[in-house]
Structures are given as structure tokens and as C-alpha cells.
Amino acid sequence: MDAEREPAGVRAPRRGTARAGVAVGAVGLLLAGCASMPDRGEVREVRASQGVDSQVRVFGVPPADKASPTDIVDGFLEAMTSDDPQLETARKYLTDDAAKNWKPGSTVTVLSAGLDRFPVQGDKESEGHRWKVTGKKLATVDERSAYQPETGGGRYEEYLQLVKFKDQWRIATPPSTLVLSESDFQRIYKPVNKYYFGDGTLVNDPVYVRQRSDPDSRMDPTTQTVQSLLAGPSKWLGPVVTTSFLTGTELAPGTKSLSLDGQNTLRVPLKLDNKAAHVPQSQCQKMATQLLYTIKDLTASRLDRVELQRADGKTTLCWVTRASAAPLANRVPSQVHQYYVDKDFRLVRMSLNVAAEEQQPQEKPESVPGPLATAATFKVGTAAVTYDEKRAAVVSEDGRGLYVVNMTTAGPMPPALLSSKGKLSAPSWDAHGDLWVADLDPQNQGLWRVPGGTGAPQKVDVAGLDDGRITGLKASPDGVRIALLVQKGDGRKNLYVGRIERPERKGDVSPVSVRELRPAAPQMADVMAMSWAPRGRLLVVGKENGGITQARYMLADGSMVAASLPGAAGLTGIGAYEDEAQPVVASSDEDGIVWLPPGAQWRTVAAGGRAPVYPG
């Protein structure tokens, strides 16, 4: 298929792929030439698609008659980026046997830029010729559709064996996965959240599905997401979550498309094995709750109800609405205050009205009730508030002591729960009511957890920290992840997310630990502040190499930048919340405490202040 009419100033692709509705630069650098294999050749780069909109469909172009080995290699690499059913065009570049047996499935190798490919000398007795394909490996997407960032800066290397049959060159050994540049990956795939239960709370599990129908299954994005949900959690999250779907539960055979009806209801037909055929209503409703939150994140339409059906599409197993699913999901409260430390080192709270016009005054911030309101000589440095807003954890202004105070009753300041000879980080509460803090003292550095905010502090083992030093942290609202700012020898701070593993049984004395740290903001060379944000994202203030300060929403798996905030220069602290109706709050060198109403510019709350936070 050829590209349609060529717009002025844009070159249509000579070979490789055609894009419906628009002509853009070809991904491959394709050469005309004879069919004989060159004895030697220079490195050639197959560049990524530049500026290709995710709404543009890409179709592969089959190999020309007697195409050169160069064209075969380039054409195949480019055809892997197409939207062809069953990747049928890419298979035309393969031998018959290779085309039948090539099953990349959902696995993808993501490269930071284009591919280098060049011919290499093969064995004297080997039939045909070999080409080496290399690139900088950014990540892989595994069979569970989960993004796995490459932490070692590794190189991708693959050898393609070419053979000649009836005067036609073909590839006999294709790669085991799809190989895509980062830009092509973002054009073809989109991030979605699946939801599983972690200690009674719904937890998001980020994965990637195709923007359009999957080439193999022909499922639309919603159906792909449901299928991924039924298959189970990602390997990284799996140890700390469970699913309500019984083993053997599948989509009804032939299900390719799922969509909301006129009543904003999604009906999902399921094939149940004998064990799952008589699932209890309570468990079925938890299954439907997982689906409702998963699809609610995926669709722009309002989803009000999810109905699970048997495979015949006639018998209803159970259903949930937004209202009935909310208690089962057990998410954090939506109506909360914003908090910060004012210029007099007092912890204050406010309730910002996002509906107010810019000229309308907001309610004046007030000191939090309880001992902090009457402790005239105590100076607060940083703070964290429980999700029920009944207790506050504060670190003294000198950074030496951690205190937990009640905000519902008056009384004297309690003694310190944890003391440091150096400095303590800002604290953080998780959804279980446990308190987290890092000790920055070089002689005693580490991560500490205070069970229930009242127990004896416990030092937490953090696997993979190596020689890094934790300087900041934030537990996720679901309580199964923790974001850590880690400083290493060069003085820069990088952001990692670790999995919180807790004892499985009551009475189990094995310690809580943090496992499998993975980079959450690899695009940032230095991170200054961060906060958890809606849908399991992170709001990060930092700099790229040689860049200016930016505030970006990042996906917690480190895969891509979701969005950016305007006017981030000078920000020193940031606070966001699980409920998207709540505005972002921040501290600024020049303007003090500021907040960002939806669709507006930053507004000032107070001329002085620091450490803005939401509960958590």
C-alpha cells in the first residue's frame, strides 16, 4: 500500500511502510541495489519514526521482487512497526518456515533510538549471510505486558540469518520479540492500569496494550486489557497482590470487542471452568470491582456499572456500580485538607476551593489542632498526616527528632519516637497506618518503619540499594510500593520505586522489607522532590542533563512521561493526591506556597512556607 497524496515539504516513504491519511519520513534508510550480498558495508542506522501521531495507522510494504539483502533487513525491521493483522507483511520478509514459526506475541524490546545494522562475515560453510542488528536497549515488555526498564545501559544485539531461495533473499532467523524504537513503541502502545487487591485495597498494576486491535488476537484495547487482567498481575507486583478471579477464568471464546452500552454499562462474558462455575456472590462482586476500576481508568466515557455474564451472554453472574464497588475497593478518602509548614515553623492546614475564581479569597490556613497548636517553642521542619487526618508525624526543624502527635485532642508534646545524630527525611504514612522515615546520618543511614505509628522503630532492609543513600521517600496510597530518592557518589538524586513485602501471616515475625528497586524517572538526571499522584503515577520535580527544572507526571514503571506542569522553575517541594479533583500544591523559592487549579496558572497561598503535603 502506498502513502496517499504527499503533503508539501514532506517526503513520502520510498519503501517499508505506508501511513494512512498522512505521509511521513520513512523509518528505514532503504537502498536500491543488486541482489548479491556485499562483502563489506558500513554501519547503517534505521531511524525511528519521527513525529508520527498515535492516531496514524501504519501499514507495511512487502518486499520487492529480487530485493537486496539491505532492503530485506530494513523492510523487515520497519514492517515490525506496522498495524498489519498477524504482522503479515513482516512475515513476507521471512522464509516460509520462519514465517510459520515466528511468534513474538506480546513481548517487545524497546530501544532508545534507531537500530544500527550491518553485514557480518558468516561461517564459510553456512548458507546465505548474516546481518548484525544493534541498538541501545531501553526496556522490555514481557509476556504479561509489563514494562521492565533496562537498568544496566545494555546493548541490544541480534543476528539475522539471510538465505537465498529462487533468487529471493529472505530472513531465516527473526528476533524472538518485536523490536521497536521508543517513539514507535509510544505510537503503537498505550499504558493502562489493571487492578488487584493488596491487603484489602485495590492496587494499580501498569501494563501496555495496543492502541488499536492486536495483530494476533484482533482484540480491541478494552478487550486486551480485560484479558491481561484475567491473566494475573505482573511479575514485579505479583508477590504483594491477589486476584479475585479463580484460576481458569477466561473471556468467552470469540470475544474481540467490549464497549459500554447506552446506560454506561460494560458487560463482560466469561468462560468459567468447573471450579469457578459457582463462584460466591461476594467474590464475584470483587471480580467485577477489579474490572470496573480497570476499565474506568481506560475509557474516556463514564462507566457506571460492570456486569459479569456467563459465556452465553445471557446469564448474569453479578454486577457492581461505582457506588457499590467503592467500599470493596477501599481506596483513600477523597475529601482531605492540604498541609504545609508555614514561615513560623508551624504545621498548618487549608481546604482549597478549586471552583473559586482567581480573585475570590480562599479560606485562611489554620494551625492543626492538638499539641502542635499549643507547643509554642516546638519548630516543625517537615510533616506527614494520616489518611484519616487524626495524627501527624513531624520532624523537628533541626531534623534530629521524629514525633507523632494526635490532632483530635489537646495535650503536651510526646517524646520523640526516633532520634538521629544527623538528620531525618520527611516522614510518610502508608495505607496500613505504618510510618516511614529515612535516617541520613552517615553512621546510621537507612530506612525505618514505625508499625502503626506507635511501635518500636524497625530498620527496613532495602534490596538493591548498594552504595546509595536514601534522602527522601513517599509510601504509595495503596501501601504496597514506596518511592525513594537515592543519592549516590556523584551527588545527584535519582528516583526509584520498591515493592513493600510484609509478613504473610499474623504472628509472623519476619521483617517488612523493600524489594526490587526500579528506576521511576530515568529521564531525570537529578530529582529534587516527588509525590504520588492519581492512577499510580508520580509527580516529579527534577532536571534532565543540562536542562531546567521541570515538574512532570511520570509512570511509576519508569516507562514514559505522562504530562508536564507549567512554570516549574524554582519549585522545591510538591504535593499531589489520589483524587484527581484535588489540586497540586507546591513550594517555590520566590512565591512561597502555591497551588495549581485545573486549567489555570499557579496561585499563591502564602508568601512563606515549605514542605506542602497531602495526607499520606
Could you say what each language-model-derived stretch is?
Residues 2-13, 21-24, 28, 35-616:
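Bimodal "functional hotspot" detector
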